């Protein structure tokens, strides 16, 4: 869904069902805040453990969203489904021991946190799935279709438009609604940040792990890379790439979870 279509759909929804829309935005905002804050806190905490107190001294190891949210990155996340927070300030000169190892750990900390949250929330959602739906619903659609972000029920679940007659335990829908939205958002943010484009984490991982820190950028190149990233985002090209990658990862993880829980 492109930006104009999403805005139009949300505008129509707000006009026709303002209460339902505002309830959804509470879920959506909570998922955004938690996802972005934990991503950046992870960077700062690992940097602190590696010897750099910069993030701690500047108050970035906090759950106060005002310290973390980047206006453009947050708007992008709302409109496009992926975005970023304010980068945590890191001073590599404070690192103890191996500089490249410490820098690599700091770079992957945010992505590792998002992937962990994705796995935990999707696993809990898999466990709750047979408790949420009437048995005939699961039999008709299949468990995976009711859990996948590409499945038939995802939109109905996260937008709160499921008929209670289909549910075995209606109150669980509120929990499942957040878990599936939270899982999808964390996976998208993780994959997005792994792209090897400055200023994303993937660039630092590539530079530290593969290039051994040999690639340096001046301010002009850094700004050019940021502009190129924004153009890719708003052109829709990046959305298509992310959807393919996240869809494949989610499908594989879901297959494993359904086998482990015996609910396939």
Locate each region found by the language model.
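Hydrophobic transmembrane alpha-helices and their immediate loop junctions
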Residues: 1-264
């Amino acid at each position: 869904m492109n930006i104009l279509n999403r805005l139009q759909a949300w505008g129509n929804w707000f006009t026709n069902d303002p209460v339902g829309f505002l309830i959804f935005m509470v879920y959506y905002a909570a998922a955004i805040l938690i996802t972005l804050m934990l991503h950046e806190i992870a960077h700062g905490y690992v940097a602190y453990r590696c010897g750099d107190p910069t993030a701690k001294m500047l108050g970035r190891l906090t759950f106060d969203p005002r310290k973390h949210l980047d206006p453009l990155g947050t708007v992008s996340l709302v409109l496009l489904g992926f975005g970023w927070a304010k980068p945590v300030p890191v001073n590599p000169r404070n690192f103890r021991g191996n500089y490249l190892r410490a820098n690599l750990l700091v770079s992957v900390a945010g992505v590792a946190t998002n992937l962990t949250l994705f796995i935990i929330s999707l696993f809990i959602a898999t466990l709750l799935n047979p408790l949420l739906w009437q048995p005939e619903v699961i039999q008709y659609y299949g468990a995976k279709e009711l859990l996948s972000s590409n499945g038939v029920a995802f939109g109905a679940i996260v937008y709160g438009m499921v008929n209670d007659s289909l549910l075995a335990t209606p109150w669980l829908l509120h929990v499942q609604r957040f878990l599936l939205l939270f899982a999808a958002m964390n996976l998208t943010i993780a994959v997005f940040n792994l792209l090897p484009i400055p200023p994303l984490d993937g660039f630092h991982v590539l530079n530290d792990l593969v290039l051994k820190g040999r690639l340096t950028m001046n301010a002009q190149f850094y700004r050019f890379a940021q502009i190129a990233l924004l153009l890719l985002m708003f052109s829709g090209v990046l959305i298509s790439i992310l959807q393919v990658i996240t869809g494949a990862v989610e499908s594989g993880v879901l297959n494993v979870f359904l086998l482990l829980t015996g609910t396939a």
